[in-house]
Amino acid sequence: MAHVFGIDIGGTGIKGAPVDLENGKLLAERVKLDTPQPATPEAVAATVAELTTGFGWTGPAGITFPGVVVNGVVMTAANVDEHWIGTDARELFSKATGLSVEVINDADAAGLAEMKYGVGAGENGTVLMLTLGTGIGSALFIDGILVPNTEFGHIEIHGKDAEKRAAESAREGEGLTWGKWAGRVDHYLEHMERLLSPQLIIIGGGISRKSDKFLPLLTGLRARVVAATLQNDAGIVGAAMVAPSA
């Protein structure tokens, strides 16, 4: 099926659109709704249903989630209510929308999209995609195959989760200059390079639109470091890629 619906759940917004899997393009302008607060399973499911209903969608859908997802079940929850842990999200969203759905980690979805339709297309070997936003999401690929749920943003550096130091939210929250923040990102990437030896590191998330501000400041890395090209549509497109029968 070439046309499917993708939904990207974030800590502040839930966005969705139909996607053409032939080319990875959105078939309509995406719609973004506020993530309910508190972001309980029931409240988020209702918002997801509002999105699909608004488009009159009756086909399959893929949905991202900001946490570890194993066989449709949420194992960790970042930036959403802790009651998600242990929830069968696939069943919950299917009942709420009346659709056939699949659920995937948000960074993994963005990585899948970037590896098929974006800057990672055709890349073999070890590729690491990192989304720098509220936190740090990660997607690891070995010869094009996803290693799911890596959660490398939670690796400890200087006694803190890496995302507390190197996410975009740290730059904004601490008022860091681009140079100061780039130094933190550089240190984090050096750490990841020692662990994984990737040939390519892709930087995604909204910050990828400002890559000229910090990518030239990264030094000492063997890997190529490039900005993602799908930017904020990557999650929607990647979600659509894992939709049932997609």
Residue ranges of predicted features:
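Conserved NAD(P)H cofactor-binding loop of Rossmann-fold oxidoreductase domains
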Residues: P66
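A charged helix-plus-loop insertion that forms the helical arch/lid used to bind
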Residues: V74-G86
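General beta-strand structural signal in soluble alpha/beta enzymes
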Residues: V101-D106
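ATP-binding/phosphotransfer module of carbohydrate and carboxylate kinases, centering on a glycine-rich
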Residues: M1-A61, V69-V73, E91-L99, A113-M129, ...
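Extracytoplasmic strand-loop-helix segments at the start of, or within, the mature domains
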Residues: I136
